[in-house]
From Swiss-Prot:
Residues 24-199 form the EngB-type G domain. GO terms for molecular function: GTP binding; metal ion binding. Belongs to the TRAFAC class TrmE-Era-EngA-EngB-Septin-like GTPase superfamily. EngB GTPase family. GTP binds at residues 32-39, 59-63, 77-80, 144-147, 178-180. PANTHER family: ENGB-TYPE G DOMAIN-CONTAINING PROTEIN, MSS1/TRME-RELATED GTP-BINDING PROTEIN. This is Probable GTP-binding protein EngB. It comes from Xanthomonas oryzae pv. oryzae (strain KACC10331 / KXO85).
């Protein structure tokens, strides 16, 4: 499975619904607040240093970027959200586009919500998880930058987030800690994503 994930290549960028690929197969979307580490996580997942651009300008990713693993199997990088310098009209456009994507995209099989472990479950994160819950899709909370906390703090935050998402969304959301620096949690993330993409028999899940 990991070798297949590593075959991911840039396919296209969509600024509106007309530019999306045909709605078939399997897609896993990655969402996260600006600078939560979403691009870095995609790069670690695929073992590629520059698959997803790591922008130094928060909020710069303003398109849906599709990375193709196999025909009809994609990783989808959603626009970073929650950055005040993005103009209001552009924020409204992306809100409507993403809303339509989540509500109508049949190929979407799961959502990874990337959150800085020091600031998890902000309003936008909960909104993304809510989209998945409304569609009956599984979601996975990726608590990034875990190396910024001690092991005890990591586990405390992990348990707190698990409790919160379970109370809100039931058992459709799994959660893990992750560090791009130490590569902590990369294999667990691959198990989840590979399962949703149909690349392995069952996704690894930690509730």
């Amino acid at each position: 499975m990991s070798l297949l994930i590593e075959q991911a290549r840039y396919h296209l960028s969509a600024h509106n619904a007309r530019q999306l690929p045909d709605d078939g197969g399997y897609e896993v979307a990655f969402a996260g607040r600006s600078n939560a580490g979403k691009s870095s996580a995609l790069n670690a997942l695929t073992r590629q240093n520059a698959l997803a651009r790591v922008s130094k300008t928060p909020g710069r990713t303003q398109q849906l970027v599709f990375f193709q693993i196999q025909p009809e199997r994609y990783l989808v990088d959603l626009p970073g959200y929650g950055y005040a310098k993005v103009p209001q009209d552009l924020q409204a456009h992306w809100q409507a586009f993403i809303d339509r994507y989540f509500r109508t995209r049949e190929a979407l099989r799961g959502l990874v919500v990337v959150m800085d472990i020091r600031h998890p479950l902000k309003d936008y994160d909960l909104q993304m998880l809510g989209y998945a819950a409304e569609r009956g899709l599984p979601a996975h909370g990726l608590l990034t930058k875990a190396d910024k906390l001690g092991r005890g703090q990591q586990m405390q935050t992990l348990q707190k987030v698990k409790k919160e998402v379970t109370s809100r969304f039931g058992d459709s959301v799994t959660v893990q800690t992750y560090s791009g620096q130490s590569r902590q949690g990369v294999d667990e993330l691959r198990g989840i994503v590979g399962g949703w993409l149909g690349l392995i028999a069952e996704p690894l899940a930690e509730h």
